Design a protein with these regions (language model features):
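Charge-rich, low-complexity N-terminal segments
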Residues: 1-121
Length: 121
């Protein structure tokens, strides 16, 4: 069973090793989807949505929302942001009944990246 929660955050960045308009400082309203894969526990839930919101807020949004992403990570492409989120969340959401399935980052309404476990290991 897949459980998913979505978040948004606003941030600025520039792509230093890219030649094009994204080389200049600019911002996005990013959308983040965190998806867990698992089975229901003794409370008949894969994961408590409130707990997932708290974890993502503490580990991800406090660092990325209204941030200059170049101060947080090197070359903050959508791909690198998704990998960064995965690494920050993986252990925090792991339970006997579930684990992180995917992290999806939308840079625009029509452009996104999805990271799976095999992309990180």
């Amino acid at each position: 069973m897949l459980l998913r929660k979505e978040f948004t955050f606003d941030a600025a960045h520039r792509l230093e090793r890219y030649r094009g308009k994204c080389e200049a400082l600019h911002g996005h309203t990013y959308r983040l989807a965190v998806t867990l894969n698992g089975r229901s526990d003794d409370e008949d839930m894969v994961f408590d949505f409130t707990e997932l919101k708290r974890i993502v807020s503490e580990k991800i949004l406090t660092e990325l929302d209204h941030a200059y992403l170049n101060d947080v990570m090197d070359q903050p492409t959508a791909e690198n942001i998704a990998l960064w989120v995965w690494r920050k969340l993986d252990e925090s959401v792991k339970r006997p009944n579930c684990e992180l399935h995917s992290v999806q980052i939308w840079e625009t309404a029509t452009s996104s990246v999805i990271v799976f476990r095999e992309d990180v290991e």
